[in-house]
């Protein structure tokens, strides 16, 4: 057993001098491997007298357990030292300023929409919203749009099939005017409200997309008149484009839900004499407007003998294109960062 004590002391000393895990495994194999010195002692138990085997076997197993414990401690010590060295090497100076990350920005349509809402809110308009899937009544009938009107045709409107795939009275709203109908049903006049939101029409080209954004406005009280309508819209356009000298004009037009009706033009913001944007006329059509038709009031139980009102509707993408000088509407929907970063 003297040899065993010497072997144990020698192995532990070698373990403690080892500084590398790979080298430690080699030392382990030397003493505890399949052909290791301690393993050979266990194999040699058959050569000693039977009465001495139990004591010898117990002593060898104790030595083996001691070596395995020493090996485990040394392995942990090497790993801890290696981790400490790695942490020191990779130490970060937390007092240094961080690396800047790219800042996002609002989409140009969002910028234009927020500007429109802010300008109308500044003169007392409330913002209202409503469902994008509407019924035939709110989208057409309540707005004095008869069944024979072209807007009801399949090629102009996205209709939603019923559960069985048949015809349905539901559709994707073609304007945000239904929001105004719903608002009038639950809010007695006087009132001033704008209805921004997405609308849908079967159209797609350089200046139209199947989905776009509109803001429609409504003012109802006992003294609303066309003069006030012209003043509010003229003032809005001058502030939106930040041009006090922006010329405007109103042309007679027709909309089923207003009478009289008009379309508003502004002087071309791209030129002064004529260009491709304004078709060389010097004018740009920007919105439709008019005095609310009595039949619309009738559908929402408002006394048209007591109250009068005016309404208007404008396309957000249209104004954004003019404000930012964009010549293709589809650029707003392609999510090209080269385009969007220009508005940050």
From Swiss-Prot:
Disulfide bonds: none annotated. PANTHER family: PHENYLALANINE--TRNA LIGASE, MITOCHONDRIAL, PHENYLALANYL-TRNA SYNTHETASE. Gene3D superfamilies: Bira Bifunctional Protein, Domain 2. It is found in: Cytoplasm. Mg(2+) binds at residue 259. One of its GO terms (biological process) is phenylalanyl-tRNA aminoacylation. Its EC number is 6.1.1.20. This is Phenylalanine--tRNA ligase alpha subunit. Its cofactor is Mg(2+). The keyword Transport does not apply. It comes from the Bacteria. Binds 2 magnesium ions per tetramer. It is an enzyme of class 6 (ligase). InterPro entries: aa-tRNA-synth_II, aa-tRNA-synth_II/BPL/LPL, Phe-tRNA-synth_IIc_asu, Phe-tRNA_ligase_II_N, Phe_tRNA_ligase_alpha1_bac, Phenylalanyl-tRNA_Synthase, tRNA-bd_arm. Keywords: Aminoacyl-tRNA synthetase, ATP-binding, Cytoplasm, Ligase, Magnesium, Metal-binding, Nucleotide-binding, Protein biosynthesis. Belongs to the class-II aminoacyl-tRNA synthetase family. Phe-tRNA synthetase alpha subunit type 1 subfamily. Its main location: cytoplasm. It catalyses: tRNA(Phe) + L-phenylalanine + ATP = L-phenylalanyl-tRNA(Phe) + AMP + diphosphate + H(+). The gene is pheS. One of its GO terms (cellular component) is cytoplasm.
